[in-house]
Each structure stands twice: as C-alpha cells, then as structure tokens.
Amino acid sequence: MKRLLAAATALLLMGQAPPPARVADLGWMSGRWESDSAGRWTEEIWAAPRANAMLGLSRSGREEVMREFEYLRIQPGDDGIPVYLASPGGRAPTPFRLVASDATSATFENPQHDFPQRIRYVRTGDSMVATISAIDGSNAMSWTFQRR
C-alpha cells in the first residue's frame, strides 16, 4: 500500500507544471554587457531585480556616435508572468511575454508584433547572447555581449 501511494504521488508530481518564473529568477541578466564588432558597438545595462522589476538600457553606435537607444523593463504581467517591455527610441513600450526560461536563458514572445516577435537571451559565464527573430526563428539577428 505504501508503495502504491508513493508511486501515485510521484506520478502526480511529474504531471505538474513547474512554478511560473518570477522577475527575480532573471537576475542572471543583470550587469553591464558590451558587444564590439567592426567599429560598431552595442551596450545593454540591466539593474538587478528589485521591487519585482528589472530596468535596462540599450544603446548602439559607430565609433563615438550613438545611433540607437532603447529603454527596457521586465515586470510581472497581469497574470504574474514576467513581461519584457521594449521602448525603442523612447517610444511607447511593446510587451513580450516570457514563454520559456531556466537558470541561464529566457525567451520572450509577442506574435502580434511586426518585428521582432521573439527576444532570447542565453548566458554562458561572462558572455551573453541576445537574439531577436520572427516567431518561427527566421530573420534572426544576434549580439554576443561580454560582461564589463
């Protein structure tokens, strides 16, 4: 009887979805990240999670001329699942919902947005790769950042 109860409990636990990610679970993204290639540079700076939010800033340019900037924010959506809010050039934010994450990666999606529809971050040690793409992975563009 005890074995049957243990087996039933194990089956129930295996069938349960893991708890949803929290903003605090994305703290591995925090820091100052830089990418330099052929005179073009991009920086992303992420504050550590605090008060259930992460704030970020991205800027890029050539040599000493800034060409683009973007305000970034990760906070819980209405359902509690983290949402990545991107405000390119300071415009109104576009939301991307967290759809997958683990200890070193996070994928955010918004299938209704023109481009990008997917934003993915993957960290390995002091490197982090950010990739934007269409929802099917096409038209992908990636930046490999180093922690500074």
Regions found by a protein language model. Give the residues of each.
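Sec-dependent signal peptide recognition
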Residues: 2-7
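Bacterial Sec-dependent signal peptides at the C-terminal "C-region" and cleavage site
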Residues: 8, 12-22
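N-terminal helix-cap/turn-to-beta initiation motif at the start of protein domains
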Residues: 18-32
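Short helix-to-loop capping/linker segments positioned immediately adjacent to catalytic or ligand/cofactor-binding
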Residues: 20-21, 118-119, 132
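Central antiparallel beta-sheet cores of small beta-barrel/beta-sandwich binding domains
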Residues: 30, 35-112
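Short coil/loop residues immediately preceding or within conserved phosphate-binding loops
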Residues: 41, 116, 140
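Edge beta-strand at a domain terminus
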Residues: 98, 103, 123-129, 133-148
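Short cationic/low-complexity microdomains
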Residues: 107-127
